Regions:
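Glycine/tyrosine- and acidic-biased, solvent-exposed loop/turn segments at the edges of beta-strands
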Residues: 1-233
Length: 233
C-alpha cells in the first residue's frame, strides 16, 4: 500500500512534526524534529512478526532519553525500559502476547549490568538467571528444569569466564547425580566430584589440571562400594 507522509523543514533541516500514514489512513509514524534532530516523543507503528506501537523520547541533544515502550496492538506491553543520554539504563522487561514475563535485564550506561532472568514462554517457569557486569557474566549463574522449575545447573563467573565451583545435574537411566567441578579463569582446574541425588553418596572423585583429568580417580556404587579405581595421566 501507499504511504502518505507529511514533513516540515526549516533552513533545510527537518523541523516540527513528521507524519506518515498507510493508504488506509493508519498512522505509521509521528516524529518530532528540531533543527534536524529528533526531540521529544516519537511514535512508530512497527509491522512485523508482531504489530507493535513503539514510543520513545529524545532529549534536546537528539539522544534517546526517558521511558521506552513497545506495545501489542491489543494494548499489552511487549517491551518496557528506559534510556539515559542515548543509552539503555535501568530495568528492561520483555513480555509474551499472553502477558507473561519472558525476560528481565538490567542496564547501566548502555551495558548489561545486574540481574538477568529469562522465563519459559507459556509456563512462566524461570529458565535462567545470572548477573552481568559490563556486558559480561559476573557472579552466580543458574539454569532450571523447564518441566518442574528445579535447579539443574549452577556456576560462578568472573569477568565473563567460569571461575569457582560449577554444579551440573546429570540425568541417567539408573541414578541421577550432581557433578561438581572447579574452574580457574575459564579452565577446569582442581577437585572434581560426583554425588548421587538419591542419598548424596560419593559417585566419583578425582582432579583436573588445565581441563584434563589427572592422578588417581575412584568410582563408587550407590551403596558406597568402591567400583573402580584408576590413574589418569
Amino acid at each position: 500500500g501507499k504511504v502518505e507522509s507529511e514533513r516540515n523543514f526549516r533552513m533545510g533541516k527537518e523541523h516540527g512534526k513528521q507524519l506518515s500514514y498507510d493508504s488506509d489512513g493508519t498512522l505509521r509514524k509521528e516524529h518530532n524534529y528540531k533543527d534536524g534532530k529528533q526531540v521529544g516523543k516519537q511514535y512508530t507503528f512497527l509491522k512485523g512478526t508482531y504489530d507493535l506501537y513503539e514510543t520513545v523520547y529524545f532529549n534536546e541533544e537528539g539522544l534517546q532519553d526517558g521511558e521506552y515502550s513497545s506495545v501489542f496492538t491489543f494494548g499489552s506491553p511487549r517491551i518496557l525500559g528506559s534510556y539515559k543520554n542515548g543509552k539503555k539504563n535501568g530495568r528492561w522487561t520483555t513480555f509474551a502476547e499472553s502477558g507473561d514475563t519472558l525476560m528481565i535485564e538490567t542496564y547501566l550506561d548502555g551495558k548489561e549490568d545486574g540481574l538477568h532472568v529469562s522465563f519459559a514462554n507459556g509456563s512462566g517457569v524461570r529458565q535462567k538467571e545470572y548477573y552481568m557486569k559490563n556486558d559480561r557474566k559476573d557472579g552466580l549463574y543458574r539454569e532450571y528444569n523447564l518441566e518442574n522449575g528445579e535447579l539443574r545447573y549452577e556456576a560462578t563467573y568472573q569477568a565473563g569466564r567460569l571461575h569457582g565451583k560449577e554444579r551440573r545435574l546429570i540425568v541417567s537411566n539408573r541414578f541421577d547425580y550432581w557433578e561438581t567441578s572447579t574452574y580457574v579463569n575459564g579452565r577446569q582446574n582442581g577437585p572434581f566430584e560426583a554425588r548421587y541425588v538419591k542419598n548424596d553418596q560419593l559417585r566419583e572423585c578425582g582432579e583436573y589440571k588445565n581441563g584434563r583429568r589427572v592422578g588417581r580417580w575412584k568410582r563408587y556404587t550407590i551403596d558406597g562400594k568402591l567400583e573402580k579405581e584408576w590413574d589418569e595421566n
